[in-house]
Amino acid sequence: YFKKNRLDVTSYKMTLNAYAGGYTHANRFKADELIRVPEGKKGKHKDFRSHYPTQLMCYPLPFGKPILFYDVEKSYNRINGCDIRRILSLSPEYYSLTKLKIYNMRLRDPKCSMPFMQVSKMYERDEITSSGMLEDNGRLLALTQGSFITYCDNYTLEILNEQYEFEYIIMRVYIFKNMKLPECLAAPI
């Protein structure tokens, strides 16, 4: 199963660059504060997504070989172009993996307590200076000069699109069919 569906080098590298792990960034307006739970109360926390076997069995996942949906280098695609709405409209039938170049990025709401764009995920930076970029604890608040490349799955792309205003060029998009876990992988669970 795995040999038949392995990624090519380009889609594998895009997957590695898009992966971000858990979202653990705290509220930037509560930095250096100790938040106490009132006496007699319990702190509340839910992390259902970490119940991995349950998630694997209950929800569709991206499977199969990646399909090149869009590439800016291909002349026939350049004519039609590609935008974020089009990519997001592919979900839930398809999972997407997108490489995009971003310019002039800023939070839609300056009071956003947990900005999503990680400075560490800003690859191939071009003409970005400290005066042209505003960040807080490793999260991008605004970029007024220069550009960068980032890699997003469809969930990350949706969050970036909701939290930020920005100009962009879609460079490449791979899609994967979302489906239930194949029986050969589900049986051991």
Predicted regions and their residues:
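Conserved acidic
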Residues: 1-189
